[in-house]
Amino acid sequence: MELDALVQQVMARAFVELEASGRHVHVTEAQAVALFGHKLTPARELSQPGQFLAKERVTVIGPKGKFENVAVLGPERPEAQVEISLTDGRTLGITPPVRLSGNVEGTPGAVLEGPMGLVELRQGVLAAQRHMHVNSADAPNLGVHDKQKVKLQTYTQRPVIFPDVVVRVHPSFQTRVHLDYDEANACGFQNGDLGRVLP
């Protein structure tokens, strides 16, 4: 076996690429039309298949402050969601619960502003639970299964062990760990950094 292939095989068995996820918004098709006058327009693909960064941007408004030029991710979803960090929440005057994406029941709301209008969300603001997307083929090599919580060692400028990283396994996933900016800054994350699931 060639050295490069051997290195790749070892990496696949031990290490996972880290990604930092900044504040962003998911909207429904009706909300996209209300905010922008049309459905979302893809600007570039994201690491997870089928998902994209939209050309459109919104302002997220809370009781105490707002963030302008916030990224919108597509495609449209059945229910809106605003993913922010705990630090972002202080600026907005919102205390976001830590939840997995899609679990918006009972979360705080916010106002979204686009060029064509406003959308008031009664719920949907959360801080994303740190998690890892794992392709089904990689799960046995990493020794993980769907919905499992694992400890993750980061190999970053300021190495950290993160507990309670939720594993999500699916055949379409690219294997990646998603941290929010609070977590990424805490460990000194840079693009290309890796993590390892601890036994």
Please report, for each region that a protein language model flagged, where it lies by residue.
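Short, low-complexity, charged amphipathic interaction modules
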Residues: M1-F15
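Acidic, glycine-rich active-site loops and adjacent beta-strand->loop/helix elements
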Residues: T156
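Short beta-strand-centered segments at strand-helix junctions
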Residues: E19-P63, E68-P115, E120-K147, K151-Q153, ...
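C-terminal end-of-chain micro-motif
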Residues: M1, L198-P199
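Short coil-to-beta-strand transition motifs
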Residues: P159-I161
